[in-house]
Regions:
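Outer-membrane beta-barrel translocator/receptor signature
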Residues: 37, 49-58, 64-137, 142-143, ...
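Active-site-proximal flexible loops/turns
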Residues: 9, 66, 253
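Alpha-helical transmembrane segments and their juxtamembrane interfaces
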Residues: 12-13, 69, 421
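Bacterial Sec-dependent N-terminal signal peptides
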Residues: 1-23
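Outer-membrane beta-barrel porins/channels
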Residues: 20-34, 39, 108-434
Length: 434
């Protein structure tokens, strides 16, 4: 369950632009606790254990721990409940989805050359859904300060009237900030201070006085998947080494529908009474990363693990469509809605992102066939994330480097077997990168 507190209108609107920012870095860099049932029960503390498909995502040396060939998959139910509070008004939204979050197979074989110290090898192919984006949030409340008009004014001021007063046919030629100004002007939410085509200042056409009732519905869906091509080997039954070559693919959709209404107008002038603003964002991409890892059996019971996950080099494309409708009225009548729908999907230039790498150190103690205790410590420096090339995103990258920092992660897991019953428990703590 998530609790979300929002305190100003522009935050409520959650409008999306073609502006890469810290939010995107976190969206595509952070991972959910997904994987096999055993992996999740132990909170993912598998870096020194191996022998589990999802453990390959922590330490690629773990595939050689399998004693025989295996195929496995895991289906999970995702449940999100979001509670929101906006200017004292509470709301909640629940989302459930069912998805395959792990699918893989491993082939294990012994070395027929008995004189070699390399006694065992394994190759594996595994898919992990490292992040599920299915979620929904609903926010509602009365804003005593800001109107949606403030959003459009923030983009419009400085843009000539001649740019935003054209017809829909030139909408696709406008920059993002010009498109927002266009939508606000064409729906009569904002007006120019005069009719000169060179005018660059605008005013709100929404009645002043506050008490703006606002709703925002945000629905997201998609996944961040990783397909790992794995190879590992065991040396003298003590040292295990492995490598993953990972193909990444991401699919993210976000739809927002913002509504605002007021009854502030007490004059005969026509002012905006209601607004509905819809945004549909689709982001998709693919990329590459690699992992190397080792597990060492210090004794029959005690194991140590160390793994490195490289940065992920991704290439993304954003597609965005927007529409808006506004209803104006005075004390005597209400006009028909002014609807602005360019019926155009903007496909922006692809951009590249480098997510941060990660180092994981692990230790585990195995009590024969009775049980085990396992601990993982991971460190990830989010300040190393960046959009590339740097010359095009210098301001954004400077912000990432200055605002984000190191995030430490601790995972602890335990298992105890009673005949055919396994009792499992785990604990995971991950610091905020801020």
């Amino acid at each position: 369950m998530k609790k979300i507190f929002l305190s100003f209108a522009i935050g409520l609107c959650a409008f999306t632009g073609q502006s890469q920012n810290i939010k995107e870095i976190l969206l595509y860099s952070q991972e959910n606790m997904n994987g096999t049932a055993r992996f999740r029960a132990l909170s993912g503390a598998f870096g020194a254990l191996g022998g589990d498909f999802s453990a390959l995502n922590v330490n690629p040396a773990g595939s050689v721990v399998f004693s025989n060939n295996q195929v496995g998959f895991t289906i999970s139910n995702y449940h999100n409940k979001n509670n929101t509070n906006y200017f004292g008004t509470s709301a909640n939204e629940t989302d459930n989805s069912l998805d395959i979050n792990q699918l893989g197979g491993v082939y294990v074989f012994e070395n027929e050359d008995k004189s070699s110290g390399w006694s065992k090898f394994a190759v594996a192919l595994n898919y992990d859904n490292i992040n599920n984006y299915d979620n929904s949030i609903f926010v509602a409340g009365t804003n005593s300060i800001n109107s949606v008009a403030d959003y459009f004014l923030s983009y419009a001021n400085g843009i000539p009237l001649s740019v935003v007063s054209g017809n829909d046919f030139n909408y696709g030629d406008l920059f993002y900030n010009e498109q927002q100004a266009y939508l606000g002007y064409q729906s009569f939410i904002i007006n120019p201070t005069d009719t000169n085509p060179g005018t660059t200042t605008y005013t709100s056409n929404v009645a002043p006085g506050g008490n703006y009732y606002q709703e925002n519905s945000i629905v997201t869906s998609g996944y961040n998947g990783k397909l790992s091509f794995n190879g590992s080997a065991m040396y003298k039954d003590r040292l295990m080494v492995g490598v993953n070559l990972n193909a990444h693919f991401s699919d993210y959709r976000k739809s927002t529908s913002f509504f605002e209404s007021n009854n502030n107008n007490t004059s005969t002038n026509y002012l905006v009474e209601r607004v509905r603003f819809n945004n549909d964002l689709y982001t998709y991409g693919n990329g590459f990363s690699f992992q190397i890892g080792t597990i060492y059996k210090a004794t029959k019971e005690f194991r140590l693990g160390l793994a490195y996950q490289s940065p992920t080099w991704m290439r993304y494309t954003d597609e965005l469509s927007q529409s808006i409708s506004a209803v104006s009225s005075n004390v005597n009548e209400e006009l028909a809605a002014d609807v602005v729908n360019p019926r155009l999907t903007m496909i922006y230039e692809p951009y590249r992102m480098r997510t941060p790498g990660k180092i994981t150190a692990s230790a585990a103690y195995v009590f024969g066939k009775t049980g085990l205790l396992s601990f993982d410590y991971g460190v990830k420096d989010y300040s190393n994330a960046a959009f590339t090339p740097d010359r095009d995103f210098r301001d954004q990258n400077d912000l990432v480097a200055n605002v984000l920092g190191v995030s430490n992660e601790f995972r602890l897991g335990g298992e105890y077997k009673i005949k055919r019953v396994s009792l499992r428990a785990g604990y995971r703590y991950e610091e905020s990168p801020f």
